[in-house]
């Protein structure tokens, strides 16, 4: 199992491609690319990201982890 990611981009990089991440999460390629670029995932995608991360064997991706990343991105914006 992979360790807890250090950032949203590090999380997305656990997949071979952004397209693969997008497919697993159920969003479009451009939405996934913007998530990576902005270091932020919209709350509407959190449940799917948590489930997809679990299937990938990525530890530590929880609602709390995503909320911290979301808050950090909001402060930086």
Region spans (language model):
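A short, Lys/Arg-rich alpha-helix, primarily the initiator
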Residues: 1-20, 24, 51-55, 59-68
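Short, basic-rich loop-to-helix N-cap that marks the start of a DNA-contacting helix
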Residues: 38-51
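Helix-turn-helix/homeodomain-like alpha-helical modules used for DNA recognition
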Residues: 70-77
